[in-house]
């Protein structure tokens, strides 16, 4: 049996776990306060790459939760680490929000482009709430070549206050259906 007295670090998902949209769940503040008061720690984890860590710090502050940038582990950060280690120097087409592109750049990823070019060497996508048909078309066209296809996370949907919306995995499913290419997923799986 799990002895909660031995737990020192708690990991919390965010979307649909501690809040939904801009609505904090009633138990969240008290739970986090109790964890801190008992001398333990917590980190926030998310596959949602549509926001940067600084966006999340601001969002939690608006919801009444104090957090520092070091309190987060995101699929954007993990994607940046992967790209730096495996595709350094490659010219990347990135489909994602402005925050996703900024997060990659702030984490040391270089040569990021958000428009089609013949010399692109890899395709990267995240949860793109600013998705356009032009981005879908560019990814499909680029992936007719034998280049890497990297995705921030496999989530098919993201919970919101009004239901679910298509997430990174759904966009990847469209691209896979169009090209036959499957992405290499970085973020944690839904399993």
Language-model region placement:
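HAD-like aspartate-dependent phosphatase fold
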Residues: 1-14, 18-191
């Amino acid at each position: 049996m799990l002895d909660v007295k031995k737990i020192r670090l708690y990991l919390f998902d965010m979307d649909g776990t501690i809040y939904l949209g801009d609505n904090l769940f009633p138990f969240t503040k008290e739970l986090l306060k109790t964890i801190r008061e008992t001398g333990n720690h917590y980190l926030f984890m998310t596959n949602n790459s549509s926001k940067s860590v600084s966006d999340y710090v601001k969002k939690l502050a608006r919801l009444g939760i104090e957090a520092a940038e070091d309190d987060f582990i995101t699929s954007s950060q993990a994607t940046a680490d992967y790209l730096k280690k495996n595709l350094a120097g490659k010219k990347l087409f990135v489909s994602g929000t402005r925050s996703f592109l900024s997060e990659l750049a702030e984490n040391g990823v270089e040569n990021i482009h958000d428009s089609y070019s013949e010399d692109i060497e890899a395709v990267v996508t995240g949860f793109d709430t600013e998705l356009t048909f032009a981005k879908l078309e560019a990814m499909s066209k680029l992936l007719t070549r034998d280049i890497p296809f990297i995705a921030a996370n496999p989530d098919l949907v993201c919970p919101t206050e009004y239901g679910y919306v298509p997430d990174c995995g759904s966009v990847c499913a469209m691209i896979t259906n169009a090209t036959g290419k499957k992405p290499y997923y970085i973020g944690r799986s839904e399993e």
